[in-house]
UniProtKB/Swiss-Prot annotation:
Gene encoding the protein: fluC
Lipid bilayer topology: Multi-pass membrane protein
A single MF term (Gene Ontology): fluoride channel activity
HAMAP family documented for this protein: FluC
Task performed by this protein: Fluoride-specific ion channel. Important for reducing fluoride concentration in the cell, thus reducing its toxicity.
Description of how activity is regulated: Na(+) is not transported, but it plays an essential structural role and its presence is essential for fluoride channel function.
Protein species of origin: Paraburkholderia phytofirmans (strain DSM 17436 / LMG 22146 / PsJN)
Similarity field: Belongs to the fluoride channel Fluc/FEX (TC 1.A.43) family.
Gene Ontology BP term (one): cellular detoxification of fluoride
Name recorded for this polypeptide: Fluoride-specific ion channel FluC
Length: 126
């Protein structure tokens, strides 16, 4: 149990720091368009796809590694709460089109990247 707690905690800390770094580096690129949040979510989507498919093909890997990568690292990196707050801010500002676009792009790209991650493992495993 202690290894599981450490795996999630350390992974979560590292993922959160990477998300923070992406925000610092990318959120100022386009005014009003939080690219850091988008990058965090699509990167996490891809890596989660790779991880889910990879761990499914390698059940001998200790479960703590799955907890570290998926629950900790990618859980800390991906940010549904920040995405939600940004969309609500657009709605409060009366920017309904921006809010709708952000929802479609974030969710669509994240799902697409997860599928791409799974497909990557599938192709590399042939």
């Amino acid at each position: 149990m202690y290894w599981s707690i450490l795996a999630v905690g350390i992974g979560g800390a590292l993922g959160s720091l990477f998300r923070w770094f992406l925000g610092i580096r990318l959120n100022g690129v386009f005014s009003g368009l939080p690219l850091g949040t988008f990058a965090a979510n699509v990167i996490a989507g891809y890596v989660i796809g790779v991880a889910v498919a990879g761990f499914a093909r390698a059940p001998q890997i200790a479960p703590e590694w799955r907890l570290f990568v998926i629950t900790g690292l990618m859980g800390g990196l991906s940010t549904f709460s920040t995405f939600s707050a940004e969309v609500v801010q657009r709605l409060q500002d009366g920017r309904l089109g921006w809010a709708a676009g952000e929802i479609v792009i974030h969710v669509g790209a994240s799902l697409l990247m997860t599928m791409l991650g799974i497909a990557t493992v599938s192709l590399l495993s042939r």
